[in-house]
């Protein structure tokens, strides 16, 4: 981490990249969604720990993004990531460009946001846990992914 150097310089900032999967359990992509949830919680914790040192920490949570990730996930990654990529393509969630995600993320960071969900329609993923039970969310996401894994 670069925290010690930031403290020496009187402050700094970190943008960690989470995902809309940070907010939901995603069966058949469990390691991916769990790791992105970790990024969100870790960032929240270190933001609090270093707030008095003038260090800003934000978690950027994009949805599907049109990037090389989709190609790499299709060619070299686990079945779970291939499945996640396929679902995002089918749902039309790979439409946001990397440039748009970066621009929205930097704008949010400059406004001192603690986290930011990029793209149109992606905020709904963060709100689902507020209106649906965990069991219902797991069933919904599991049913979507199960169909792809079975292929």
Residue locations for each model-derived region?
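Active-site loop immediately N-terminal to the catalytic Tyr-X3-Lys motif
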Residues: 26-30
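A transmembrane-helix-recognition feature enriched in membrane-embedded lipid enzymes
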Residues: 112-144
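Active-site helix of classical SDR
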Residues: 35
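Hydrophobic alpha-helix immediately C-terminal to the catalytic Tyr-X-X-X-Lys motif of short-chain
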Residues: 38-50, 60, 69
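SDR active-site lid
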Residues: 52-120
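A short helix-coil junction within the Rossmann-fold of NAD(P)-dependent oxidoreductases
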Residues: 1-10
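Active-site-adjacent segment of SDR/Rossmann-fold oxidoreductases
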Residues: 5, 24, 45-55
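Residue(s) in the substrate-gating loop at a strand-loop-helix junction
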Residues: 19
């Amino acid at each position: 981490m670069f925290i010690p150097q930031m403290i020496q310089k009187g402050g700094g900032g970190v943008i960690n990249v989470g995902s809309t999967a940070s907010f939901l359990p995603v069966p058949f992509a469990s390691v991916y969604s769990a790791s992105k949830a970790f990024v969100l919680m870790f960032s929240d914790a270190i933001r609090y720990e270093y707030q008095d040192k003038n260090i800003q920490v934000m978690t950027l949570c994009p949805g599907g993004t049109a990037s090389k990730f989709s190609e790499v996930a299709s060619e070299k990654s686990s079945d779970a990531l291939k499945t996640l990529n396929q679902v995002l393509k089918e749902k039309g969630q790979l439409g946001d460009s990397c440039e748009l995600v970066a621009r929205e993320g930097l704008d949010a960071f400059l406004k001192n946001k603690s986290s930011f969900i990029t793209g149109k329609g992606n905020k709904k993923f963060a709100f689902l846990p507020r209106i649906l039970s965990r069991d219902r969310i797991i069933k919904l996401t599991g049913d979507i992914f199960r169909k792809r894994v079975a292929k």
